[in-house]
Amino acid sequence: PMQDDMDTILTNIREKLIAGVEKRLDADAPVGFLLSGGLDSSLVCSIAAKKLGKPIRTFAIGMDTDAIDLKYARQTAEYLGSEHHEIIINRDMVINSLEEVIRLLGTWDITTIRASMGMYLLCKAIHEQTDVRVLLTGEISDELFGYKYTDYAPTADAFQQESQKRIRELYMYDVLRADRCISANSIEARVPFGDLDFVRYVMAIDPEKKLNSYGKG
């Protein structure tokens, strides 16, 4: 691992992520942004909004029964002043789309299928109801930075090995989900966190510095 100190690491992560977003904003078709209200997609949206200097178009999805994600996405959209769209789905819509999503994914992995339902229905609605044909998403951040695994990793080496494994297997899970669900609806997915310069830098950070030693999320 490289030996940059924490201040240098934070500066480089910030600059490289901004560059990763910026280079993906150029498109010959209208661009939209998937916004869950979580940190990853919110960062992508905030960088883009600042760089473009005009309201971006954000899209969020939620169930009609418990739309907690919609609440946080709405808060972020209001803060950014985006042109925000909410797609509300219900149990029947999910069940009716299940076979089609499994066919698209070509996998029986339950977690991948479950996580794909919302993305598929959201992209279907975007394709049918708007002219957006390019979508930026917050994918891959969890695999790079560890997400919940940093709370439980027994050692820094174990964390690094798990992170490397998740990156190697991305095409089987999160990338598979995003690629199939988005492209099936004739939309191009762009993933700033997957920028090669960004990924190489983050994966070279001393894993000790990635472990959750702060007792916070």
Kindly give the residue locations of the regions a language model identified:
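ATP-dependent adenylate-handling active sites, centered on carboxylate activation for C-N bond formation
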Residues: 2-215
